[in-house]
Structures are given as C-alpha cells and as structure tokens.
Regions:
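Surface-exposed extracytoplasmic segments
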Residues: 22-232
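C-terminal motif of bacterial Sec signal peptides marking the signal peptidase cleavage site
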Residues: 17-20
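Bacterial N-terminal signal peptides that target proteins for export
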Residues: 1-11
Length: 232
C-alpha cells in the first residue's frame, strides 16, 4: 500500500473501494454535529493550486499547538503544513470527488503519511470561483475510540499554496498564505470550542489581512475572508 506523500491515483481508488465507507456508522445513523469551513480569496480558486483545511483534534483547550505552514525548505516534508494536526481536506483538481479529499494523518511524528478517507460530507467552489466551502461530520474527525460527541475543541487553519514540494533537497521558494498575517505571524491558527453551535468570522477577529501572500503577490492564493461554524 502507498504510504508516503499523496497516494498514486490507482492506489487511491483501490483503497477507497475497499475502505472508503468505513468511517460512517454501519447503521447509517448520521453524526449530528458538523464543522463548516469556508474561505474566500482575492482572485479565483485555481484548479492547479492546492487549498488545505487542517484540523487538530487533540483536546488542546489552551491552543498551545496547532496546524501551521512551513516557512522555508524542506517545507515540512509534505510540502504544505507542519505543527499539530490529525485530519485535513485538500482541494486540487487531480483528486477524485470533484477535486476534494479528506485525509487522516497516520503518524503524528511523520506528517507526510496520510490515509484518504473519501469525500467530505459537502464540498464546493462558489459559482463566482472565489470561495471554497467544506463540511465534515465530527464522526469523520474523531480520534481512534473517541465518541464524536466528546470533541470539545479544535484547532483549525487554512493554507493556500501554488505547489507542495516533498523533495528535501528542493530549496526553491513557493508562494503560500494561511490564516492570519502570513508575512508577520505565520504561526496563527484558530482555536474553536465545539461544545455548542457557534459561528466565528474573520470580521469577529480581524486576523486576516489582504495582500499577505508569502514569496509573491498572487491573488489566487490571497485569503481575504473566512468563516468557521459548528452546527448540530
């Protein structure tokens, strides 16, 4: 089985056929609580760029650790994120399910080893091509043996990048943006309590400026607005 980096397409489809439905209860009972993440870029969501929603579910109420972008080569080993996270959704045109895939990190000490779980509950790009919206149920992001109802807090980040270099000898720059002022505070992420329904918006925090793409000024990577919701 493929274990390093992103699975090759053939391996990915075989895995999904064998195990892609395992994350849903056999009874068909839906998990009531959902995480809804949406964000907008200054330009357009480009199919050849990579857009990530990273989720850290480790009961960290103080928000000590969370998912952050690597700021220099070798780019975290996976090409897009480092820090602490167990799940992520990627949008990229080469992926199945209209370019959306939910992944589970298999080893917290090796963030380049992923297991594809299939499509998010909902995922779409807005008609104007500027916004991306993803919905995942808590059953899909629960830790091994964890009741989804016991998820009380999450750390969340959004990362947009033009490429995901995995070669440790690749020292060339890449463009990226994440939540917060990426040029001044690249280690920003959200800590969201999930014990009740709530909506957190960029307007509530003022943490996301425009024009903060690192190593470039590409509007298609420039995150300018976001909203995160916990919904029952």
């Amino acid at each position: 089985m493929c274990t390093r980096g992103r699975f090759q397409t053939t391996c990915l489809f075989l895995f999904l056929l064998l195990a892609g439905c395992a994350r849903f209860p056999e009874t068909g009972q839906a998990v009531s609580k959902r995480l809804v993440v949406q964000f907008r870029v200054a330009g357009q969501i480009r199919p050849d760029y990579h857009y990530f929603i990273l989720i850290d579910n480790d009961n960290d109420f103080l928000g000590v650790n969370g998912p952050v972008p690597p700021i220099a080569p070798p780019w975290g080993g996976n090409g897009f994120a480092t820090g602490s996270f167990q799940y992520f959704v990627e949008h990229y045109s080469a992926l199945p399910f209209n370019g959306f895939m939910l992944y589970k990190v298999l080893d917290p000490d090796r963030l380049q080893v992923f297991q594809p779980l299939g499509a998010p509950l909902e995922a779409s790009v807005s008609p104007d091509g500027k916004s991306l919206r993803v919905v995942v149920d808590f059953g899909s992001i629960a830790r091994e043996g964890q009741d989804p109802a016991d998820i009380r807090v999450l750390q969340i980040n959004v990362i947009a990048t033009d490429r995901t270099p995995k070669d440790p000898t690749d020292t060339s720059l890449k463009m990226w943006d994440a939540l917060g002022d990426s040029r001044q505070s690249p280690n920003s992420y959200l800590t969201l309590q999930t014990d009740a329904d709530r909506i957190l918006r960029n307007a509530d925090t003022g943490m996301e400026p425009a024009g903060d793409v690192v190593n470039g000024n590409d509007p298609d990577l420039d995150i300018v607005d976001w909203q995160v919701e916990v919904r029952s």
